[in-house]
């Protein structure tokens, strides 16, 4: 299956992409482990992470408070493991793809280039081959809504949105992301 990926400041001319190349699992793992112990433990970890993250931002060691995104990823992974055991691809151990090059260009622009945070030299557009049986299409709108809910500390809503995401439901205006944890091969570095 031919898919398209944009890589922000991490692609190194390798013949393949690493699942979880950004190492996001290690940040979501404390929230996942806490959920395995119970909701009260999760809440304690969440509020502790809030405090520590704010300290790191104040000290200039982090640009922003990422703990909320990490908590959402932890909740999504917990829901996948406990309620959707048949879903083999984890958001934390995969590569994210787009179905078309144009879509990948748009995502790259919206996520990395529009605000001037990165240059076109730092954001690589790639054509990649990956096994079709390891690729799953989800509506990212549920994930985006979950990030908004966690900003309001509405953890229950995040669980509900994770369930819709993994049940393959679609919003009225779906924003499709394709996750794959299969072996892959970079076929071409595209130009803008």
Task: List the predicted regions and their residue ranges.
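An acidic/histidine-cluster motif and surrounding catalytic segment
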Residues: 61-86, 92
């Amino acid at each position: 299956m031919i898919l398209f990926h944009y890589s922000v400041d991490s692609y190194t001319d390798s013949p393949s992409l690493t699942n979880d190349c950004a190492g996001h699992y290690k940040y979501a793992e404390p929230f996942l482990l806490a959920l395995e112990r119970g909701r009260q433990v999760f809440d304690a970890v969440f509020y502790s992470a809030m405090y520590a993250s704010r300290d790191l931002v104040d000290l200039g060691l982090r640009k922003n408070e990422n703990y909320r995104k990490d908590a959402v990823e932890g909740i999504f992974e917990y829901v996948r493991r406990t309620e959707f055991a048949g879903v083999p691809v984890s958001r934390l151990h995969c590569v994210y793809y787009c179905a078309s090059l144009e879509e990948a260009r748009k995502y790259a622009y919206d996520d990395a280039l529009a605000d001037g945070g990165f240059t076109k030299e730092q954001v690589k557009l790639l054509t990649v081959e990956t096994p079709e049986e390891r690729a799953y299409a989800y509506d990212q709108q549920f994930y985006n809504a979950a990030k908004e809910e966690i900003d309001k500390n509405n953890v229950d809503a995040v669980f509900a949105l994770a369930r819709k995401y993994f049940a393959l439901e679609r919003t009225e205006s779906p924003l499709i992301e394709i996750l794959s944890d299969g072996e892959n091969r970079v076929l071409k570095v595209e130009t803008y």
